[in-house]
Amino acid sequence: MKLIIASDIHGSAYWCGKLVELIEKEDPDRVVLLGDLLYHGPRNDLPRDYAPKQVIPMLSALQEKILAVRGNCEAEVDQMVLPFPCLADYALLDCDGKTMYLTHGHHANPDHLPPLTKGSIFLSGHTHVKLDKEVEGIRCLNPGSVSIPKDGSHSCIVFENGEFRFHIWED
């Protein structure tokens, strides 16, 4: 199974467009979105080309592939405008025989993991910082932020053939 794993779009039409271009190029089986899709939140500056109404049709066109979880900036109104579920606090995905736990990261995170078996994969966003480390036998990954990176590079993750690789966009 091939996945694109992204987080923290925060309503940026420009960076969501870059993500859509990558999705079209890579043609993944699923697109995993780890929350904070439309709104920037009170702690963030506005991202480049902040236009949540333009992001809605971009993501809606991918609804058949999207598996999304709620971020700390999502609200019920987001579910009213997006045609795919986006308000669950977490989701589980069986991928190539591994359990993937998907969450935004504002509740569970690599420092406070949910009960998972060794060999599981924990995917979270929220910090806007890329991460790939093992904690107590669980691989923890964070794709960073599509639109408001706090580590200097706009990014997501491509999962293919059992391997994770970071995709970095130039600013």
For the regions a language model picked out, list residue spans one by one.
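Internal catalytic-core helix/loop-beta-alpha segment
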Residues: 82-131
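Core catalytic region of metal-dependent phosphoesterases/phosphodiesterases
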Residues: 2-95
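Active-site environment of divalent metal-dependent phosphoester hydrolases
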Residues: 10-14, 39-41, 72-79, 107-113, ...
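Thr-Gly-centered strand-to-loop micro-motif
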Residues: 6, 103, 142-144
